[in-house]
Amino acid sequence: IRNGVVTGLETDYIAPGIGRELSKGILPKPIIFRTHGSRPADILSGHSLIDIAFIAAPASDSMGNCSGKYGPSACGSLGYAFADAMKAKKVVVITDHLMDYPLTDASITEDYVDYVVNVPAIGDPLGIVSGTTRMPKDPIALKIAHRPSMLPVC
């Protein structure tokens, strides 16, 4: 950000540490907040443009056919990354489980991938949590979190 490589952000959440820095006006473009679910639609419609997408894939072959079903970091569907892969100018698949070519039941196919990077581990599953999925500790946030359970089901 300080070097001008990142000039704007589109997100559904910002952690407090980076939020404090961003609130000082260090980005030349405004931050766009949107719901988690509307992100793929905005990408596919061309409203949100992606220069480069880094897709963490639990398994990939050397050409970029990748899946979330295999490997030590298996997580299930990579569906949330479809829009990124389809619309980004460049796509980098990062994996910790390189499989033989071709990975035939890929979620994202090589047609959309420019580069594949094999790393020792794509992440620590225990550390993958955001402020939106972490249980709140303060009384007001707990009260807000509890409220939806009080709504009648029709």
PLM region spans:
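Conserved alpha/beta enzyme-core scaffold
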Residues: 1-154
